[in-house]
């Protein structure tokens, strides 16, 4: 009963703030955006207070699942000069490594870990932008995992790995992701990497650690947008050709 009272109070406060904090001159678009944001917040609070039970679907997969692990930022000190500007691949690999090894981290430890990985990559003559195959090599030879590269991954394939507590590393067109993640600067990077840690069929969303912004922990992307964004680094070697890159994801296994 007490939980229900809290829920009702949160809903009423959210609706009240909709009108209290709006300026006098507003557009229908702003009203709609504010309403959508309020509804999302209410859903989040409802899920926290009264979580919906997990349901096993006919496919054998649960309708939702989430892997919990530490968030690794590609720019732990908010310095966006090189190598941090292009350290999303390293941060994604470390996200999986820290999950499997149950590590916690600090900005200093993250910085040191990224720089050590880059030093290894330099022995292989890798550039700032690694493709999936190169990331797999780093995962194997530097971090000590087995790797699998999945071509043309489907939503169900990704969900199957996640449901088994296996994170999925993606490389993607950040400008496509920008449609749902306005925390990116300059419309998002051409080439980006992130780690899928969860999914929610009710919301039709993947849950990722998007290492590219400080707000990227457990960030939600729609199934359709994230699948659309997935591309390996293009064979041309030019980031601008990202949409010509093959659709691949990387799995690291203990």
Region spans (language model):
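Residues that form generic nucleotide/phosphate-binding pockets
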Residues: 48, 117, 138, 142, ...
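Repeat-unit-sized solenoid/scaffold elements
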Residues: 128-129, 165-183, 230-250
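Mid-length scaffold segments of soluble, non-membrane domains
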Residues: 123-156, 160-165
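Short, flexible active-site-adjacent loop segments at beta-strand->alpha-helix junctions, enriched
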Residues: 94, 174, 212
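Stable alpha-helical elements in mature extracytoplasmic
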Residues: 84, 89-96, 110, 131-139, ...
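Active-site-adjacent substructure of cysteine-protease-like catalytic cores
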Residues: 153-207
């Amino acid at each position: 009963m007490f939980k229900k009272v809290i829920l009702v109070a949160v809903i009423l406060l959210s609706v009240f703030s909709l009108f209290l904090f709006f300026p006098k001159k507003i557009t229908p678009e702003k009203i709609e955006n504010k309403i959508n944001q309020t509804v999302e917040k209410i859903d989040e609070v409802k899920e926290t207070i009264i979580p919906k039970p997990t349901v096993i679907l006919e496919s054998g997969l649960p309708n939702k699942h989430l892997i919990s692990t530490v968030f690794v930022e590609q720019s732990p000190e908010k310095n966006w000069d090189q190598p941090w500007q292009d350290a999303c691949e390293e941060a994604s690999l470390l996200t999986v490594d820290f999950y499997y090894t149950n590590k916690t981290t600090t900005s200093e430890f993250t910085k040191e870990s990224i720089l050590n990985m880059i030093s290894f990559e330099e022995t292989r003559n890798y550039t700032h932008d690694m493709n999936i195959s190169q990331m797999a090599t780093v995962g194997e030879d530097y971090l000590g995992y087995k790797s699998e590269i999945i071509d043309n991954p489907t939503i169900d394939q990704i969900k199957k790995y996640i449901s088994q507590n296996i994170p999925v590393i993606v490389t993607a067109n950040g400008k496509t992701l920008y449609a749902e993640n306005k925390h990116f600067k300059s419309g998002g990077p051409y080439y980006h990497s992130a780690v899928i840690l969860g999914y929610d069929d009710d919301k039709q969303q993947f849950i990722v650690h998007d290492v590219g912004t400080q707000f990227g922990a457990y960030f939600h992307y729609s199934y359709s947008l994230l699948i659309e964004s997935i591309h390996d680094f293009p064979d041309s070697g030019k980031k601008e050709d990202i949409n010509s890159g093959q659709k691949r994801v990387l799995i690291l296994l203990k």
